[in-house]
């Protein structure tokens, strides 16, 4: 979807289980010369991926690069700002690694991909994990009871408990977890290379987390920031994981990090 009519473009990538429409929130701070192009990630909205490839031949980094390159070339966009939230943050980091020369700025909002969760690795990369998860698609009660027991034993934070219940509450959501995890399982950034590309190309960069986010906590940001030669500090907002929020919009507007006009 496109918001605005300006030639200065922000390409925006949403989070897991969400949609491109989430970025309508930023319409309030668009200047006349600016526009937002928000796309639905694969398996989300009206974006599809061949079902025959999900288990055996997932999306590769090269395919992701060529898809976006062809897309922006078709639209006649030479350079663009890149904004990624949660899962979209992981996809944005891969793009920044592969095509830094085309970025005007990079904003990562609670990005996935700073570390690989062992559950994700087990389900997406092992045959046993896939078989086990496919059984959960039809019969999720046992895994939900296990999550509740871990919460009762205080092993699991209540926000993580709620997050799991929300993600697995319907069969369509459980299928989306399986499809999205497997389709994108090869798309993880190389953090040291990403930091070097950002610095070499002088890309204005901001990393934003929610103070109360238990899904992707701010401490994960150290895994990326330690690779920069110059010191970078993450921005902490008084929010949880739902960071596509008016507070974030206000912060980016006030600090000038929303679609900055030029690289320093």
Where are these regions (language model features)?
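Conserved HGGG/HGGXW glycine-rich cap/lid loop of the alpha/beta-hydrolase fold
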Residues: 2-50
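Catalytic histidine-centered segment of alpha/beta-hydrolase-like enzymes
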Residues: 215, 236-250
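Post-His helix in hydrolase/transferase enzymes
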Residues: 220, 244-258
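Conserved alpha/beta-hydrolase catalytic His-Asp/Glu region
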Residues: 139-199
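Active-site loop/oxyanion-hole signature of alpha/beta-hydrolase fold enzymes
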Residues: 38-83
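Short alpha-helix in the alpha/beta-hydrolase fold that links the catalytic acid
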Residues: 193-195, 203, 217-226
């Amino acid at each position: 979807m496109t918001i605005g009519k300006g030639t200065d473009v922000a390409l925006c990538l949403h989070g897991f289980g969400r949609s491109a429409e989430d970025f309508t929130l930023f319409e309030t701070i668009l200047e006349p010369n600016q526009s937002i192009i928000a796309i639905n990630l694969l398996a989300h909205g009206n974006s599809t991926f061949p079902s025959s490839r999900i288990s055996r031949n997932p999306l590769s980094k090269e395919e992701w690069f060529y898809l976006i390159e062809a897309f922006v070339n078709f639209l006649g966009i030479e350079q663009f700002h890149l904004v990624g939230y949660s899962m979209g943050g992981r996809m944005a980091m891969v793009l920044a690694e592969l095509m830094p020369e085309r970025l005007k700025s990079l904003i990562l909002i609670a990005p996935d991909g700073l570390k690989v969760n062992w559950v994700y690795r087990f389900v997406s990369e092992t045959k046993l994990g896939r078989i086990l998860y496919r059984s959960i698609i039809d019969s999720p009660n046992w895994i939900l009871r296990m999550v509740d027991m871990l919460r009762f034993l205080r092993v699991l934070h209540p926000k993580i408990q709620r997050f799991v219940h929300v993600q697995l509450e319907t069969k369509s959501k459980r299928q989306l977890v399986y499809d999205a995890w497997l389709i994108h399982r090869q798309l993880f950034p190389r953090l040291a290379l990403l930091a070097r590309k950002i610095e070499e190309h002088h890309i204005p960069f901001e990393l934003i987390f929610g103070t109360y986010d238990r899904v992707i906590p701010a401490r994960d940001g150290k895994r990326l920031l330690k690779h920069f030669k110059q010191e970078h500090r993450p921005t902490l907002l008084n929010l949880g994981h739902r960071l596509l929020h008016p507070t974030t919009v206000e912060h980016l507007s006030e600090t000038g990090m929303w679609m900055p006009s030029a690289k320093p």
